[in-house]
Structure formats: structure tokens, C-alpha cells
Amino acid sequence: MFGFGPSYDSYKLKVQLKLAVSRIQILKNKKANIVRDEKRNVAELLRKKNEESARIRVETIIRDEYLIECFQIIEVLCELLHARINLINATTEMPLEMKESIFTLVYSSQRIQIPELEQIKNQLKAKYGKGLENEANCHCSTHVNPKIVHKLSYATPDPSIIFQTLSEIAEKFNVDWCGSDYPPPPQLIMPQPIIVQQQPQILQPPPQIIHHQQQPQILQPPPQIIQQQQQPQMPSFPIMSPPQQPTFSQIQHQQQIQQQYQQQQQSPQFPSAPPSFYNNNSGNQTPQFPTISTNNSDGYSNDKFNNGNNNYNNNNNNNNNNNNNNNHNNNNNNNNNIPPPYQPSSDTGYPDYDELTARFEALKRSNDF
């Protein structure tokens, strides 16, 4: 890094912090001895009634005591900065928890003549920029320790503090001194009471408080919740579509069915008589029976057996002729009892069920069911 000022060196900063602590301890002890000697000299001046000289020297004692207190604060801040040197090295910007410590050291280095504090200020300026010193002076009331700002100021001490310090020195060294000419400290000055002439107060009757009678609160019933009764749902009817007109092929098929139905009505089929046991067209075949072996020893001959068979066949033929005649007569009677063919009474050509029922009853009576 090329620049006009010194570069930041953490090791050098750490060494300067340790040296600053040692130097501050030496200066603190040295200033404490000087203050003790100065107080003895001021006590001798008070014993000789040389109060003006004592008052001037007391101001020096007060500044030295302030400086000792500042040394104690700076010593603690240097130890804190030495302990958190790694935090300073790890961050590029100034940590918030270290801001007051850094600004206080930079601010005090301008007012206390310590070489180590000057080196610490240069290292911090190399780390955080050259404007650090100017920023510390501008924001001394916010970022700098307020005790350091107050005790390192160039203003003269307050007269009350001077009077208090002289009183402490005279008491410590057993000097008979009465500081009547010096003003007391501000906490000892008693304010004079202010006498105010009070005018006689006219007694007025107290205002009448009118109590309004509270009307009894009438409890109102809660609002009724009107539940809407669910109306019964009407059954939904199927959507009736208009009847489809029959096609030409359907009309022809319907006419054919009507014609077949009329033909069946004109020639009704009736139950026929059960067929005869023997068919006449078969040539009067006689049933075959198993032949029985006969011997002359039984007293029966084959001629007698054949004669018996012929007589049986003749009787069967006569019975068959009689049955055929009866069937022919029954057929003639049935033809006479057949009702006339059905003629549809409706214009549409469809059968009337009442007429069909009547015809069916007549047919049952004719067949004796």
C-alpha cells in the first residue's frame, strides 16, 4: 500500500498500548506526589493569611487532580483496546462497541502530552482514515467519554470548587481558616423565601352536585333468529320429449303385423282331438306279441291260436271305423259353433280388448271348458 502516512500495523498498535499503560501509571504516581506537596504549600499560605496566593495554587491542584482521574480512565481504555485488538483487525469499519474507546483515546492524545498516545492515534488514523481526529473533536459530546471532556477542558475551575478545596486543605492540615470572603458552594446557598401577600379568600358555597337518577335498565330479550323453513323439494318429473314420428319402414312393418293378425283371426286354430291309438292309414297293422312256444303235449294246436288272432283283428277294425265317424261328426259341429272372424271396431286398426275378451269367453263355452 502506497501512501504519504504510516500504514496500519496491528503489532505496533499492540505494543504501543502496553507502553501507554506503563507510562500512564508512572505519570499518575508522579502527579499524585506533586499534588501532595502543593497541598502542603497551600496550607502554609493559609496559615500566614496569604489567601490570594493559596487561591491561585489551588487551581493548579484542581487541574492535577482532574488529570489523575483522566489517567485512570485512559489506562482502562488502553487495556480494553489491547484485549480487543483481534476485533479491530477483523473488521474494516469501526465496531460500535469500540467506538467510544477509540474516540476517547484520539481526543485525549491532543491534550495530554504522552508519546505513546500519539503513536496510538496515528495507527488508528491509518486504520479508519485521516478524518478520525477531526470527527473526534466535532462529536466529542456524543462519542467521547463525558468525564474526559469535562476534566480536560481549558476552562477555569468554578469559585465554589476552589472554596471547597481550600476548606478541605485547611481541615486536613489543621489550619484555622475562615473563608468568609469566599462565596459558599452552590449547594450551600440557601434561597431566600419569597413573601407573597395573600388576599382574603371569599368563602363560596360548594357547588351542588345533582345526582341523576339512573333509570333501571330493562333487559331486552336477545334478537330471535328466524330460521327459514326449508320448503319441501318438489319431485322432479322427467322431461317429456315430443313423440317421434314413425318412419316409412316402421309403418310398413306395422301394417304387415296387422295383416298377419287379421289372417290368424279369420282362421283360428282350435285344439284337435288326440290321435287314435292306431293309425287307419297304416293298413290295420296288428300289434305284435311275443310268440309262445307250444307243444302238442299241452293240448293246444296252432290252428286254434290263429283263429283267435283273426277274430281280435276284426274287432279292432270295427272300433276304428266307429271312431272315425265320431270325429267327422265332431268336426262338423265345431265348424257350426265357430264365431265369425274378428273385424276391428276402432278406426286405428288395433284390436279392442273388450271384444277379444267376449269372444274368448264364447269360445270357452263352445268347447265346454
Curated annotation (Swiss-Prot):
InterPro entries hit by this protein: Ist1 (IPR005061), IST1-like (IPR042277)
Bias (Polar residues) ranges: 277-305
Coiled coil feature spans: 12-59
Sequence ranges of Low complexity compositional bias: 225-239, 246-270, 306-337
Disulfide bonds: none
Signal peptide boundaries: none
Any Pfam family the entry gives: Ist1
GO biological process: protein localization; protein transport
UniProt superkingdom: Eukaryota
Keywords from the UniProt entry: Coiled coil
UniProt region (Disordered), positions on chain: 224-354
Family to which the UniProt record says this protein belongs: Belongs to the IST1 family.
Name by which UniProt lists this protein: IST1-like protein
